Swiss-Prot record:
This is ATP-dependent L-serine kinase. It is an enzyme of class 2 (transferase). Keywords: ATP-binding, Kinase, Magnesium, Metal-binding, Nucleotide-binding, Transferase. InterPro entries: Chromosome_partition/occlusion, ParB/Sulfiredoxin_dom, ParB/Sulfiredoxin_sf, SerK/SbnI_C, SerK_C.
Length: 255
């Protein structure tokens, strides 16, 4: 995925997750809660697609938020936002058991090919602390849990370790910095679905810097959302037992 000014690479392991048809249910958009911030370009793209097809091509995946009458959006934030922005009242959904062992949660890890110095300088300019740390590619598995909790990211290079402060809220600032500088063409932005692959690329020299953060649990996500929190884009990576097959729900059914 790339644009005229910024290049983004998504690296995921190969999977054999099947597509499955599930009859969607229509849920009011105001009863759905997103847990990640939106990317404007993706939202506009989906609004145009939905308008041109006069339908929502596939249902979003949601789960009940315990103790409320609302649902957490597990997958489909931008489709939900597009339908809502277009003025429709409902959206097709598949309801899952979030805490089932069949539903996995992992965390996206950003990395860059290029110079990390502008990122660290801009993060500091926006109020985040940047401190030296003592970890390396070979000792990344030993990063102190308290340091991970308090940091937005631990940045590792072959000869560099920096802890950026801010915790989960700081991740939003760093994510914004990464996206802005990437769009200026300062570096290639890489998103990893698996830490092991990221570390291999870092060791080989293909990747220059990796941004490691605390892994989230499903309980973390539910607690954060119930407290009104919204993560940075590309934070959670949910792995479902199936991909929803396309159903093409007509827009007239969503009024």
């Amino acid at each position: 995925m790339s644009s005229s000014t910024g290049k983004v690479i998504i690296k995921l392991p190969k999977t054999s997750i099947p597509y499955k048809y599930v009859e969607p249910v229509l849920i009011e958009v105001d009863k759905l809660v997103n847990h990640e911030e939106l990317v404007d370009a993706r939202l506009r793209e989906l609004m145009d697609k939905i308008r041109s097809e006069n339908a929502v091509d596939m249902p979003i995946v949601v789960t009940p938020i315990p103790g409320t009458d609302k649902y957490l959006i597990v997958d489909g934030h931008h489709r939900w936002a597009a339908v809502k922005a277009l003025g429709y009242r409902k959206i097709p959904c598949i309801i899952i058991d979030y805490f089932s062992q069949d539903v996995k949660l992992k965390t996206w890890l950003p990395g860059i090919i290029g110079d990390v110095k502008p990122v660290l300088e801009e993060a500091a300019r926006r109020g985040l602390g940047v401190a030296e740390c003592r970890y390396s590619v070979d000792t990344s598995g030993d990063i102190d849990a308290k340091l991970l909790e308090e940091s937005s990211f631990i940045v590792l290079g072959r000869d560099l370790c920096r802890a950026i402060s801010g915790g989960v809220e700081g991740q939003k600032i760093v994510s914004q910095v990464l996206n802005e500088l990437n769009m200026k063409g300062l570096f290639t932005l890489v998103y990893y679905g698996e830490l092991s692959e990221a570390l291999e690329d870092l060791k080989s020299g293909w990747l220059h810097y990796l941004f490691i953060r605390k892994s989230l649990t499903k309980e973390d996500v539910m607690r954060y959302v119930r407290n009104g929190g919204v993560y940075a884009p590309k934070t959670t990576r949910h792995i479902l037992p199936f991909y929803p097959a396309k159903t093409y729900t007509p827009l007239d059914a969503l009024r």
